[in-house]
């Protein structure tokens, strides 16, 4: 029997992230309708701009990735329903899968996905419906074209957990799915996880391998909130601002808005954890926003704070490690 290919898939609102045995990648969550009214190349005096990936199929035709909002009409939807199979979520995954194949070779076996979802989709009355919707669109055969190249990918297995759980297992597991020496006992202690994503800041506390519900929550004060503080007049799409932020072209604006956003995030943490964090063995800080808030959060939690070497891809990497352990 052939070996399945295990992938961790972090369904982030800021980027779709994949991690497998050879490594990982992210595709920035910019999606735009392909208007097909392109400027011709070679306009004298203007530099030709590289187009983002073009993903097409029965779902439509979309530009995907960094710069997509400059080439078509932006599609920005931060509702959780998008993760249950909206066209913009499909094309993000397809772009990521195509890029993964470009970098590591074509998939020669069926895929097994360990999917990380926002905490809000894993709790509450709608949790089962959300999870069924995610599984429904991910399972089976996927046919799509990326930049004119046809792809067929088959997903045989879909398993789901919360995104902060991925961060926890990235910390305690090695690449073989085995406990890292000295960290296995962490699962018995109380460990806090702060995931600062594009849309949400999620808090999870685990004790004896189970979630402590009163310390677990998610709120929409992620990096988008910082961008909203910068973009009060609404002159830019969130995707355009995100690109400028990643390129280091918002340093002045970020310097002015960061203290406000930092206080809002700290307020949400304080509201849920209070002083109880002092008893936690570790506080893991992950997500793209961890790079922006690293100084503030490490100051708040002192030596207990742990920021991984790649906080952006930590969740996807941990999801992959978990899938290897559970195979």
Model segments located where?
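Conserved active-site beta-strand-loop modules that form the wall/rim of enzyme catalytic pockets
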Residues: 190-194, 199-205
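A mobile "lid/hinge" subdomain adjacent to the ATP/sugar-phosphate binding pocket shared
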Residues: 223-261
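Short hydrophobic/aromatic-rich motifs at helix boundaries and adjacent loops
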Residues: 199-202, 241, 265-267
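Nucleotide/phosphate-binding catalytic cleft detector across ATP-hydrolyzing
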Residues: 1-191, 213-223, 251-282, 288-327
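Glycine/GP-enriched mid-protein hinge/lid loop-to-helix segment characteristic of carbohydrate kinases
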Residues: 202-237
């Amino acid at each position: 029997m052939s070996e399945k290919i295990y992938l961790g898939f972090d369904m982030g609102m800021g980027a779709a992230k994949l991690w497998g045995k050879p490594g990982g990648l992210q595709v920035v969550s910019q999606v735009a309708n392909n208007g097909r009214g392109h400027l011709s190349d070679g306009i004298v005096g203007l530099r030709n701009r590289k187009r983002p990936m073009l993903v097409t199929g029965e779902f439509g035709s979309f530009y995907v990735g960094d710069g997509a909002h400059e080439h078509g009409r932006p599609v920005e939807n931060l509702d959780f329903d998008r993760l249950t199979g909206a066209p913009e979520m499909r094309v993000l995954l397809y772009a990521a899968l195509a890029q993964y194949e470009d970098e590591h070779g074509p998939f020669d076996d069926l895929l097994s996905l360990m999917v990380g979802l926002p905490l809000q989709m894993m709790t509450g009355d709608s949790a089962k419906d959300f999870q069924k919707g995610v599984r429904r669109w991910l399972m089976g055969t996927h046919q799509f074209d990326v930049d004119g190249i046809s792809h067929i990918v088959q997903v045989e297995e879909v398993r789901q957990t919360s995104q902060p759980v991925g961060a926890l297992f990235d910390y305690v597991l090695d690449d073989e799915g085995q406990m890292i020496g000295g960290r296995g006992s962490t699962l018995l202690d109380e460990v806090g996880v702060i995931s600062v994503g594009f849309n949400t800041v999620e808090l999870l506390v685990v004790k004896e391998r189970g979630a402590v519900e009163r310390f677990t929550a998610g709120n929409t004060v992620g990096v988008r909130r910082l961008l909203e503080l910068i973009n009060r007049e609404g002159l830019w799409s969130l995707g355009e601002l995100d690109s400028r932020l990643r390129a280091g072209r918002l340093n002045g604006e970020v310097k002015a808005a960061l203290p406000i956003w930092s206080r809002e995030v700290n307020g949400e943490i304080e509201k849920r954890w209070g002083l109880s964090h002092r008893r936690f063995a570790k506080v893991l800080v992950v997500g793209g926003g961890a790079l922006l808030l690293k100084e503030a959060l490490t100051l708040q939690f002192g030596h207990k704070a742990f920021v991984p070497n790649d906080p952006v891809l930590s969740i996807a990497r941990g999801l992959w490690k978990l899938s290897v352990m559970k195979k």
